Amino acid sequence: MNITDVRIRRVDNKNPGSKLLAYVTVTFDDCLVLHNIRVIRGQKGVFIVMPNRRTKVGEYKDIVHPINQNFREILQSAIFKEYVKENPSSLELELG
């Protein structure tokens, strides 16, 4: 499965403590689209969060997620590459 498009929607938060940097949409093989991946700046660096939902007991469960580390790294790398391309001066990536 190839990543054929990555679209970044940067979030300009008024709250200086907000960790959310952007929402991302990724297209695979020009036939499948995955919306609402989030780019977050955490204490250990920048990372992606897959789309999720909150359960009745308050836990968050991913709706979709990579099943191996190799694909997660490919996905994260494609997202970060596009983010830096669109926002060259706004982010020094400290990978988490």
UniProtKB/Swiss-Prot annotation:
What keywords are assigned to this protein? Answer: Cell cycle, Cell division, Septation
Gene3D superfamilies xrefs: Stage V sporulation protein G
**Which cysteines bridge via disulfide bonds?**
none
Coiled-coil parts of chain: none
UniProt cross-references to Pfam families, sorted A to Z? SpoVG (PF04026)
Question: Where in the sequence is the signal peptide annotated?
Answer: none
| UniProt GO BP | division septum assembly; sporulation resulting in formation of a cellular spore
Task: Fetch the InterPro entries from UniProt.
Answer: SpoVG (IPR007170), SpoVG_sf (IPR036751)
The record's function comment reads: Could be involved in septation.
Family membership noted in the UniProt record: Belongs to the SpoVG family.
User: What name appears for this protein in its UniProt entry?
Assistant: Putative septation protein SpoVG
What organism is recorded for this protein?
Borrelia turicatae (strain 91E135)
